[in-house]
Swiss-Prot record:
One of its GO terms (molecular function) is CCR6 chemokine receptor binding. The lineage of its organism: Eukaryota, Metazoa, Chordata, Craniata, Vertebrata. Belongs to the beta-defensin family. Keywords: Antibiotic, Antimicrobial, Defensin, Disulfide bond, Fungicide, Secreted, Signal. Has bactericidal activity. Potent activity against E.coli ML-35, L.monocytogenes EGD and C.albicans. Residues 20-25 form a propeptide. PANTHER family: BETA-DEFENSIN, GALLINACIN-1-RELATED. It holds the Pfam family Defensin_beta. It is found in: Secreted; Cytoplasmic granule. InterPro entries: Defensin_beta-like. This is Gallinacin-1.
Length: 65
């Protein structure tokens, strides 16, 4: 019975992590919708950071439109 008390927080922690993982999937399409593009680690020159596509990719937007 003690194992159940130890496993319950672990199961809840896994469920919490799975619930938040779906948020990262829509960010890339949100970036394209804002007429931006995804770049690895830094945006090229003449662009601004307008958000994040994923952990290592930034959403970049051109300065001139």
């Amino acid at each position: 019975m003690r194992i159940v008390y130890l496993l319950l927080p672990f199961i809840l922690l896994l469920a919490q992590g799975a619930a938040g993982s779906s948020q990262a999937l829509g960010r890339k399409s949100d970036c394209f919708r804002k007429s931006g593009f995804c770049a690895f680690l830094k945006c090229p020159s003449l662009t601004l950071i307008s958000g994040k596509c994923s952990r290592f990719y930034l959403c970049c937007k051109r300065i001139w439109g």
